[in-house]
A protein has these predicted regions:
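N-terminal, polar/charged subdomain of small-to-medium soluble alpha/beta proteins
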Residues: 1-99, 115-137
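A charged helix-plus-loop insertion that forms the helical arch/lid used to bind
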Residues: 98-109
């Protein structure tokens, strides 16, 4: 599994129904982490658990002196909101080595990837994070 992590002041993801031209906010957060999560064919539940644990423990949030020294876990322990926006993203497994058209052959099929992304979300919630998600498509 791959996770692309970004610290954010605010983030939102929009989606639209197949039969509509209207976009709506599927998930939004204030300060926290926005994480794009992708899965490949042979990823397992154990890897999803490891990714969630890694996200929870990354010391990339500012402490009181403005130094990146705190994790979501630290924020949660001090009573702050440990907020995360998880966005499923098959393009993390895009291959652009040949030509100009990416290959998605390394990205897992939705029926394999969706439960793994859901597992990352569930694990983060069980650790104490407030998790918002996009729409899996």
């Amino acid at each position: 599994m791959r996770g692309l992590v970004q610290r954010v002041i605010r983030a939102e993801v929009k989606s639209r129904a197949a039969d509509s031209s209207e976009w709506s906010v599927a998930g939004a957060i204030g300060p926290g982490l926005c994480v794009f999560v992708g899965a490949t064919h042979d990823d397992t539940v154990a890897q999803a658990d490891k990714l969630a644990s890694k996200i929870w423990g990354l010391r990339i949030l500012d402490d009181s002196e403005g130094v990146m020294n705190r994790s979501l876990s630290d924020v949660h322990e001090t009573g702050g909101p440990a907020t995360v926006l998880i966005v499923s993203q098959f393009t993390l497994y895009g291959d652009t080595r040949k030509g100009r058209r990416p290959s998605w052959i390394d990205a897992a099929r939705p029926e394999h990837a969706e439960p793994l992304v859901d597992r990352v979300v569930d694990q983060l919630r069980s650790l104490g994070a407030t998790v918002t998600t996009g729409v899996f498509r």
